[in-house]
Amino acid sequence: MNMPLLDIQPRTLQFAVDLKKQTSCVVQLTNTTHHYVAFKVKTTSPKKYCVRPNVGVVAPKSTCEFTVIMQAFKEPPPDMVCKDKFLIQSTAVSAETTDEDITASMFSKAEGKHIEENKLRVTLVPPSDSPELSPINTPKQGAVFEDSILKDRLYSQSETLAPPQYEGEIVKEPRMVGHDELKAADNAKELKTPKMATVDFVEDRYTANDLKATKDSYDSSRMAKETGFDPIRSHKDADDGRAIKATTNLDAPMKKAMDLPRDQGFTNGIAVDSEPKISKERDVVQLQKTDGQNVRGLDELKLVKDIEEMKLKVDALESKLKQADSTISKLMEERSISSQHRQSLQHELAELRTKKIVKEVHNGFPLLYVCVVAFIAYVIGHFLRT
């Protein structure tokens, strides 16, 4: 396999140094082969970065993306030099392989597999060099407004577009557009307003699903009183000479973005659609619920297995107890039999002893018998002599 398995873009990960805020970088993997390719991402500082997802399978001639999130800096670094690196390991796998089937052994070189490794460097850039959205009044994203169409949806504040938000990423606060920037934009290009105006924006930067016009109607004087913004003149209407006013205040905090419908015109405030964020939050909640259900199911399965194992152990103990009872009863019977046999032996031994004593007594004549016989013989002899 001389041809590389994956084409990785970018080769250098750039992170903006921003205190107390997370920054992220998206890496795109392109499978240039006709095989399914599994990849795994490693880093030299796992506590500092979060990779989502860190493993995956890329289909032939397709692309896959993963996001690298850098944790927020607690204090500014002394220099902008970063020695952290990322290692992307990739290998060809079968078409049936899923993300759950990927293990560390798949990327082991001991089995003789072809493992491709690509290293990515990390560079730190100041926050000013990080990509930010341009003001809404620039010529590239300028829009033509019709006062007769937008008079009921006029806002008295100017807003900028927020950058797209990835999962687990903290989005930076949008930057307010000041008087100087608006004047410079007006001097650079004067916007003429026909009666039926449309909104022109760059499609390659933001799609139609990301931008919406407002549905609600606000009073411009009321909003100006509440926010305290200074009014600035932007464009004049060709018919009745009325000007669309947009206000901004560099010291005031940014309000939340306006929710604008697709089929209507824009006022001076344009905001990113919140539906993807809500859908992502719903997906996260659903994933958490499914994870909780899976965890509960696994816990229940473990509990059932433990109960079955306990039942098997109890049955084994009961069988052992029965065997012990049977052996104890056998031993008791043997003990009673042995005691009876012992008693019989003792009785026989006593009988043998009594028989031996009787035999010993009957050997010879008794002393009384001898005395009587001697006395009778003496009497008979005395009478015979006389």
From Swiss-Prot:
Disulfide bonds: none annotated. This is Vesicle-associated protein 2-2. Residues 1-363 are cytoplasmic. It comes from Arabidopsis thaliana. The keyword Phosphoprotein applies. The lineage of its organism: Eukaryota, Viridiplantae, Streptophyta, Embryophyta, Tracheophyta. One of its GO terms (cellular component) is plasma membrane. Interacts with cowpea mosaic virus (CPMV) NTP-binding protein (NTB). It is found in: Endoplasmic reticulum membrane. It is a single-pass type IV membrane protein. Keywords: Acetylation, Coiled coil, Endoplasmic reticulum, Host-virus interaction, Membrane, Phosphoprotein, Transmembrane, Transmembrane helix. GO terms for biological process: intracellular transport. Residues 300-353 form a coiled coil. The modification N-acetylmethionine is found at M1. The modification Phosphoserine is found at S279. The chain crosses the membrane at residues 364-384. May play a role in vesicle trafficking.
